[in-house]
Amino acid sequence: MKKLSILAVLAASPAMAATGPFLSLSNTNFIVTLAFLLFMGILLYAKVPGRILGMLDKRSVQIRTELEEARALREEARTILASYDRKQKEVQEQAARIVASARDEAQAAAEQAKADLRASIARRLAAAEDQIASAEAGAVRAIREQAVSVAVAAAADLLSRQMTPAAASASIDESIKEVEARFH
């Protein structure tokens, strides 16, 4: 600070170029120089430059601390951003896996439904064929029974027309003998 004061005094040397005696109180340049030197002396006596330097040092330390905090916050923000990006990628991958799994399950369910439908159709078709076969067998049986009934009725009618009482009596006796022979 002393060097600064000396430099300020030397910088006032252009005031020496004024006309008239320099050390006169009527010379304004001399008065201004005296006031400046007195002001500088008061500042030095009150240790203002040291205080200013102390405040500037404190401010520089505070700025340095804030810069370090800002760097730490920036690094923390980068770390959080990287973590967020990783988590977002993981969530996207998990969502893709869930969609693929759901798609596979839906396809499997569709295939199972198709297989179940085919099996149901096959069962119904088999049941219908069984019903048709049963109906055919019933119809054939009914036709045979009807044919047997018609044949028996026709044979009975034919026999009753052709049979005489003596032939009927002989036929009955012969049938009785045949039954006795079979049972004994």
UniProtKB/Swiss-Prot annotation:
Query: A Gene Ontology molecular-function term?
Result: proton-transporting ATPase activity, rotational mechanism
GO cellular-component term (any): proton-transporting ATP synthase complex
Any Pfam family from its record, for instance, is: ATP-synt_B
Q: Which domain of life is it from?
A: Bacteria
| Membrane-topology descriptor | Single-pass membrane protein
Compartment(s) of residence: Cell inner membrane
Keywords carried by this UniProt record: ATP synthesis, Cell inner membrane, Cell membrane, CF(0), Hydrogen ion transport, Ion transport, Membrane, Transmembrane, Transmembrane helix, Transport
Main location class: membrane
Any transmembrane segments, and where?
4-24
Complexes and interactors:
F-type ATPases have 2 components, F(1) - the catalytic core - and F(0) - the membrane proton channel. F(1) has five subunits: alpha(3), beta(3), gamma(1), delta(1), epsilon(1). F(0) has three main subunits: a(1), b(2) and c(10-14). The alpha and beta chains form an alternating ring which encloses part of the gamma chain. F(1) is attached to F(0) by a central stalk formed by the gamma and epsilon chains, while a peripheral stalk is formed by the delta and b chains.
What family is reported? Belongs to the ATPase B chain family.
For this protein, the record's HAMAP family field holds: ATP_synth_b_bprime
The task this protein performs is described as:
F(1)F(0) ATP synthase produces ATP from ADP in the presence of a proton or sodium gradient. F-type ATPases consist of two structural domains, F(1) containing the extramembraneous catalytic core and F(0) containing the membrane proton channel, linked together by a central stalk and a peripheral stalk. During catalysis, ATP synthesis in the catalytic domain of F(1) is coupled via a rotary mechanism of the central stalk subunits to proton translocation.
The protein's name in its UniProt record:
ATP synthase subunit b 1
In its UniProt entry, the species of origin is given as Cereibacter sphaeroides (strain ATCC 17023 / DSM 158 / JCM 6121 / CCUG 31486 / LMG 2827 / NBRC 12203 / NCIMB 8253 / ATH 2.4.1.)
